[in-house]
Regions:
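Conserved HAMP-HisKA connector
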Residues: 2-25
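Detector for a conserved hydrophobic position within an alpha-helical segment of the HATPase_c
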Residues: 206-207
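Short beta-strand/loop element within the Bergerat-fold HATPase_c
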Residues: 151-163
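Short conserved segment of the HATPase_c
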Residues: 176-188
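A conserved beta-strand-to-alpha-helix junction within the catalytic ATP-binding
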Residues: 89-101
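Histidine phosphotransfer helical core of two-component systems
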Residues: 30-68, 88
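Conserved catalytic submotifs in the C-terminal HATPase_c
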Residues: 98, 109, 114-124
């Protein structure tokens, strides 16, 4: 079984390498197109009263928008295809959640979203690649923001779970139908205009790389709940209260 798993890992690594190389090759001509569109936009802006220039400028702006969309897609794809070698460190989950919420708070305020947090005080430490996990959590928060275009509430809750810890994100947004739920974590699936469909797929990939799981419950018109569960290695349990790794045993 281990040989089969290693072959699968090797095959995935090679596919990811080729995909990344292809994406980088696309980026180079895309950068040239974007630069020339900027130069054309400057030229056509010289005479705003000229109807021919105005029409040309509008067309240039459309091309610029599509170039930006392709750039976003490439960036998201490179992040999704990346072979992740996690730098796992003992981490206080509540501290990490607070940091990401602090970064997200201005966006929530702009969207009239109230964040309510219930962070359990007695959580054991978990092993996280903090940068990767922050990216996954931010993807979920942005997804909740997009689900509440008219504002709402977002509850962020941590708690103990069987053999680990749980992180819940509960929004009062538009919710999802059964079809959307069944395809939610598929790469390139998106219900948003201009969306790449890679944010949630990448988030799940990161959570699963940590040995965790991500689940979702949703009701159309009522809201959505994402739940991340993460394992707690036995050697970290002894340091759960103080947030320290257990020291060496005394003779």
């Amino acid at each position: 079984v281990s040989d089969v798993n290693q072959r699968l890992v090797d095959q995935y690594t090679e596919i990811a390498r080729l995909a990344g190389a292809l994406a980088h090759e696309i980026k180079n001509p895309l950068s040239t197109i974007r630069l020339n569109m900027e130069l054309l936009a400057e030229d056509f802006s010289q005479d705003p009263e000229n109807p021919l220039y105005r029409r040309a400028l509008n067309k240039v702006k459309v091309v610029q928008q599509e170039c930006q969309r392709l750039q976003d897609l490439l960036d998201d794809f490179l992040n999704f295809a990346k072979v992740r070698r996690l730098n796992l460190e003992p981490t206080n989950l509540n501290h990490q959640v607070r940091q990401v919420l602090g970064f997200f708070q201005p966006k929530a305020k702009e969207s009239n979203i109230e964040i309510i947090d219930y962070l359990a005080s007695d959580l054991p430490m978990v092993l996280l690649d903090r940068k990767a996990f922050d990216g996954a959590l931010l993807n979920l928060l942005l997804n909740a923001q997009q689900a509440m275009p008219n504002g709402g509430q977002l509850v962020v809750r941590t708690s103990g779970a069987r053999d680990g810890v749980a992180l819940d994100l509960i929004d009062t947004g538009c919710g999802m139908d059964a079809h959307t739920l069944s395809h939610l974590f598929e790469a390139f699936f998106s219900t948003k205009r201009g969306g790449t469909g890679l944010g949630l797929a990448t988030a799940r990939k990161i959570v699963e790389a940590h040995g965790g799981q991500i689940r979702v419950q949703s009701e159309l018109g009522r809201g959505t709940q994402f739940t991340i569960t993460l394992p707690v290695p036995a050697q970290l349990t002894a340091g759960a209260v103080t947030g320290q790794l257990p020291g060496p045993s005394q003779p």
